[in-house]
């Protein structure tokens, strides 16, 4: 099976963490709809919402305009959505885009010149207990049970989650992130690794046998930045752009 090529003009965006008072992702999507941003492909690297799953009615209803707009854009644009630790069980929302749950990540693509590219949200390679505890929190049984209780409590659980996540600090520095990235690339066989999740916005070129490149996409929620793919001298590069100052 041939790998999907990442096209020149593709756009990467990660960690928008959209909530009641954070609307940058909505503006970004509408800039695409209006034609002011014209991606050849759109890669959503997860945590696009502070919380969203198919089984949680409060969040599904709150973000329904986003869901409809993303699916509408997917009619004419290849959209690849990598579920994160804040947004999962999304497949039943969409007809026109490709969803990659955490169990399928990383997903391997390739550049236009044949270099392999592994893409993931980033919350993978977890310790055994943590991995399966988080998978349980994503089960249909657990989420439907919580949703049932939430309805009885007039959405107090969902509103509490929203309020707590809204206060969470998203702009932080991980001091030893180079070494964390170095350990992560050792788990990959691909030439280029692209992840979100860590909120660091760093690129590292490792002088290992594979000469791997690690790219951590900057947090859209903090920097309002997205990244456009360009090719030069048979190499891929991600060019940073900002939506600040762009009118929808």
Which residues does each PLM region occupy?
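A short acidic, often aromatic-flanked loop/helix-cap motif at beta-alpha or helix-coil junctions
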Residues: 108-111, 222-223, 246-247
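Core catalytic region of metal-dependent phosphoesterases/phosphodiesterases
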Residues: 3-9, 13, 18-112
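Active-site metal-binding loops of divalent metal-dependent hydrolases
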Residues: 14-17, 47-48, 85-87, 122-123, ...
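Short, solvent-exposed aromatic-acidic interface loops
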Residues: 238-248
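Conserved beta-sheet core of the metallophosphoesterase superfamily
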Residues: 98-104, 114-118, 123, 128-134, ...
């Amino acid at each position: 099976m041939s790998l999907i090529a990442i096209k020149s003009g593709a756009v990467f965006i990660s960690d928008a963490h959209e909530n009641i008072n954070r609307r940058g992702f909505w503006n970004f999507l509408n800039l695409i709809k209006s034609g002011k941003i014209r991606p050849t492909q759109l890669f959503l690297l997860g945590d696009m919402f502070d919380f969203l799953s198919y089984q949680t009615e409060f969040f599904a209803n709150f973000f329904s305009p986003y869901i409809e707009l993303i699916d509408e854009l997917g009619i004419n644009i290849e959209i690849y959505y990598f579920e994160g630790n804040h947004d999962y069980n999304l497949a039943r929302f969409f007809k026109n885009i490709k969803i990659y749950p955490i169990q399928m990540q990383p997903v391997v693509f390739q550049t236009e010149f044949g270099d392999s590219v592994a893409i993931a949200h980033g919350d993978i390679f977890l310790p055994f207990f943590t991995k399966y505890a988080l998978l349980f929190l994503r089960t249909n049984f657990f989420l439907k049970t919580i949703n049932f209780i939430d309805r009885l409590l007039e959405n107090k659980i969902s509103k509490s989650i929203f309020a707590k996540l809204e206060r969470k600090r998203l702009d932080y520095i991980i001091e030893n992130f180079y070494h964390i990235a170095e350990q992560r690339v050792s788990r990959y066989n691909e030439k280029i690794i692209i992840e979100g999740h860590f909120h660091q916005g760093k690129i590292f070129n490792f002088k290992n046998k594979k000469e791997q490149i690690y790219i951590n996409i900057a947090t859209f929620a903090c920097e309002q930045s997205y990244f456009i793919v360009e090719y030069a001298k048979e190499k891929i590069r991600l060019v940073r752009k900002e939506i600040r100052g762009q009118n929808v």
